[in-house]
């Protein structure tokens, strides 16, 4: 079976000269469809950099990022945008839009995909049920606890039914 995500020899450095820091050095990972794969490590170990390289939010200095066997590094901007719709990320900082309700935050990625407002709201309500927050649909991020914000971020990441989360 072909891996859904494969990273081959990824390296990423930040800074230059004496200030240069190697965040990733020749990292290779293969994740099969349906596989649960976790990345753990100490603070500053490069976990976030590695995850951001999966959809090229962070471009590695060298190596390959493959999705269904296709190299993301060689894709056009349009092709990469289409692949990114199939890969969702849940970041430690929630990145919720403060001026939008919980429901509207979950609808946001669907709106970007051109889904009708009615269908987006229906999907968002389903996801609020799944994450156990159906009563928070009209709450703004400032009215939510940290755990509730994280669950809204999870629901938002699931909204597009991604192949990789």
Regions found by a protein language model. Give the residues of each.
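ABC family nucleotide-binding domain
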Residues: 2-165
